[in-house]
């Protein structure tokens, strides 16, 4: 509720009644009728902006007009009238209040002195009926400053500098019905200050500095219907009956204060109250009988407080309640029978609340409920009889599908197929490759296996999207809490971490061999196997630790439909947040920095050697080829990881990140490395291209011989892959053959780099 909305309180003339035509059509659970025809449509087709019924019935009454907001349109014009430059509309333009200050405007019996730098209440004819003194410099209201205005009905004193009001300031205003004191500096109201305002219906004192009130403060307000004290600094309400001198009070707005609790006696005399707004306070405790006297209450707003526990029967006397807001409270648990007595409830807001024990039983008694609001759209499946449930999506999934976007539903299969095919192809072709360095081949196969897991992960997500197609919301919560989701999420993290660590290992091997060619020792079989095993063990530990302690990590992988824990700081435990940051901004960021630094150093080393080794004439061309290859390796790593680092960092800063980001990252960004690694590290290397050319040449030769009837003996399909250290003949590595050591270094570097170009 904003400060401007206070003017909507004109609607407080009586309690509204919502009339709805009876429906003879009976629909099954989760389906709702199309007006007066026999057709029924599922919940997800109602209020979706499309005329699915054919008679617009599914798009009617979609707005949440429960509570007093039902009267919004009726009094919308009045709101603008009261907040416009000329708030009055007298029947005659002629001024009937005698002489007025030069800067003021007058029409009929209404006086407008807004923004005229007045420092005191002007003296005009006593027959004035409305007076607006907004945006002036009035600091005090002395005794009897309005005593002559017996006919005054509306008094506007907003946006002045009023700090004190005399107990006799409003004496004589026997006809006043509306008093606005908003946006001033009032710190205290003396008991009896409103004693003469027997006809006052609206009292608006929002955005002041009031720190305490008591029942005597409102003595004399026998006709008051609306009391607005929002955005003050009240820390507590009196332990005595607050409405003792306001028997007709219908609307009490205390939003935006610092109230810590509500006591049983406070509201005991407010039996006519129909709207109670207590949002944005610091209420942390409620007694079971707090609202017992409010049997006519129609709307209750307790949103954005610090309530942790709700007594089971706290709402048992609120049988007329139609709108309840409990949003953004740290409520630990909602009882299964919490709402059983709210038989007329039509709108329930539970946004921002993690309902760990959610079940259909909670909402089944609410047969008149038409609107419900949750923190997670998956919760909507537990209220299938409610026509409108929000949110409809978390940006990743929708009520209908695990993957909300058609683009995502298509490309999850395309990306997974490309990823799996590329990596499986490289793995399967290894038996046909005679490699002098089995250890390098072993590392590449290990990398392909890790990347292939990412393709499998995407296949599984696509498969469950197909399984739940059209009715995902029925299965959403169970899916995210299921073992399948936990395992598939672990698979994605396993693939990611093993791939990152393997790329770092391969990069460091290249870095040492190229930058320090004479110190490079051929990696032994035992060392390589040990490193690979340690990398996989580390990946398994990182991926599966969150499954070992549910209390510490909560539902780590089940924060969204794709089971990937990229950013979910709003639902994670502190331990899970630290763990997630350690993975994405710890291990992965460090690995990315190492890779970028290593490739930069490798290229710089080759370039520096070429400056002094004039014997190598084609070095510039080789450098360009090398630079291009290194650029694409670093570029794909950056393309994959920089967006993830940015998203994770922004989530730590509490920046709101659209849910769609996660699905796009998981389907299009995260698999980039997994899909391109086979291309960058195998399919575009010189040995592979030479093997393809050789195979094609042999195929053409064999075909030519066959056409001539000659017998051919083509070499088998074998790719001879050379480890960089083995490509130079031993006799060429003798130092005596080179004038300068750097020449030998360059030859060695050039030879090593041939396998990467």
Swiss-Prot record:
Lineage, uppermost ranks: Eukaryota, Metazoa, Chordata, Craniata, Vertebrata
Subcellular location: Cell membrane
Domain LDL-receptor class A positions: 26-63
Transmembrane segment boundaries: 409-429, 444-464, 487-507, 528-548, 578-598, 630-650, 661-681
SUPFAM superfamilies: Family A G protein-coupled receptor-like (SSF81321), L domain-like (SSF52058), LDL receptor-like module (SSF57424)
One annotated GO biological process: hormone-mediated signaling pathway
Subunit structure as annotated in this protein's UniProt entry: Interacts with C1QTNF8.
Described function: Receptor for relaxins. The activity of this receptor is mediated by G proteins leading to stimulation of adenylate cyclase and an increase of cAMP. Binding of the ligand may also activate a tyrosine kinase pathway that inhibits the activity of a phosphodiesterase that degrades cAMP.
Cytoplasmic side: 430-443, 508-527, 599-629, 682-757
Major site of localization recorded for this protein: membrane
Molecular function as annotated in GO: G protein-coupled peptide receptor activity; metal ion binding
Glycosylation sites: 36, 127, 264, 272, 325, 368
InterPro entries the UniProt entry points to: GPCR_Rhodpsn, GPCR_Rhodpsn_7TM, LDL_receptor-like_sf, LDLR_class-A_CS, LDrepeatLR_classA_rpt, Leu-rich_rpt, Leu-rich_rpt_typical-subtyp, LRR_dom_sf
Ranges for domain LRRNT: 91-127
Domain of life assignment: Eukaryota
Disulfides per UniProt: 27-40, 34-53, 47-62, 485-563
Membrane topology: Multi-pass membrane protein
Residues involved in Ca(2+) binding: 45, 48, 50, 52, 58-59
Alphabetized UniProt keyword annotations: Calcium, Cell membrane, Disulfide bond, G-protein coupled receptor, Glycoprotein, Leucine-rich repeat, Membrane, Metal-binding, Receptor, Repeat, Transducer, Transmembrane, Transmembrane helix
Descriptive protein name: Relaxin receptor 1
Segments in the Extracellular topological domain: 1-408, 465-486, 549-577, 651-660
GO cellular component, one term: plasma membrane
Pfam families in the record: 7tm_1, Ldl_recept_a, LRR_8
Family: Belongs to the G-protein coupled receptor 1 family.
LRR repeat residues: 151-172, 175-196, 199-220, 223-244, 248-269, 272-293, 296-317, 320-341, 344-365
